[in-house]
Regions:
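Conserved ABC transporter NBD signature motif
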Residues: 63-71
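Conserved ABC ATPase "signature" region
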Residues: 70-71, 117-134
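Short coil-to-helix segment of the ABC ATPase nucleotide-binding domain corresponding to the Q-loop/switch region
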Residues: 101-108
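Conserved ABC ATPase signature
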Residues: 139-143, 147-149
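Hydrophobic anchor residue at the start of the ABC signature
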Residues: 153
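Conserved catalytic motifs of ABC-family nucleotide-binding domains
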Residues: 160
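Catalytic Walker B motif of ABC-type/P-loop ATPase nucleotide-binding domains
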Residues: 164-167
Length: 221
């Protein structure tokens, strides 16, 4: 199987006035194309740092990270920006939608960053996440939390990313709506999407095929 993410002996240290903080301590693991993985651990364990590194939003203090076979240390800032924009889809706990844009415009925003908008593609991914077409011209504040998260998932899919990175995607939803979002993720994974979910909720982790547990910056299992 093709490895889309590979961490080798990765260390991340944050220098602070009170002393250095080691967020990740010699982490090694890989993710194969088509996997559905949860990352679990207590608050402060290093989950968010790990997600930032996987999303090419930060760089390690030491060790090696490869994304789709390319070592990120060999990429320029421009190449990293392009890779993040074109190959990674992000889904957040608080949706991060633009309140003054309608749903089509929100979903199309990553395309705008690439220099062009395909409205039909936006409609296609919104249908894929099962959002009612009557809502496509509404603004986010006119939608429920579950509907807004479906829009966020559609936005993450618009550029056909290799990897979906999800930070507590159900954390701001009730249990029933959260379950519907995870069922949607499961369906996307069945269609071939590689999905990584950071969560503290065992109920979310049960939808995934593998769990990586982080404790004190180290992989526990």
């Amino acid at each position: 199987m093709e490895q889309v993410i590979q961490f080798e002996d990765v260390v991340k240290i944050y220098p602070l006035k009170a002393g250095d903080v080691t967020a990740l301590n010699h982490i090694s693991f890989s993710v194969e194309r088509g996997e559905f993985i949860s990352i679990m651990g207590p608050s402060g364990s290093g989950k968010s740092t790990l997600l930032a590194l996987m999303g090419c939003l930060d760089t390690p203090t030491s060790g090696s990270i490869s994304m789709s076979g390319r070592a990120i240390r060999n990429m320029s800032d421009e190449e990293l920006t392009s890779f993040r924009r074109d190959k990674i889809g992000f889904i957040f706990q608080y949706f991060n939608l633009f309140p003054l844009l309608n749903i089509i415009e929100n979903v199309s925003f990553p395309q705008m960053l690439r220099g062009g908008v395909n409205e039909e593609k936006a409609r296609e991914v919104l249908r894929a996440v099962q959002l009612d077409e009557r809502l496509f011209t509404h603004t986010p504040l006119e939608l429920s939390g579950g509907q807004q998260q479906r829009v966020a998932v559609a936005r993450a899919l618009i550029n056909d990313p290799d990897i979906l990175l999800c930070d507590e995607p159900t954390g701001n939803l009730d249990s029933k709506t959260g379950a519907s979002i995870m069922e949607l993720m499961t369906e996307l994974n069945r269609k071939g999407a590689t999905i990584i979910v950071v969560t503290h909720d065992p109920g979310v982790a049960k939808y995934t095929n593998r769990t990586i547990r982080i404790v004190d910056g180290c992989i526990a299992s």
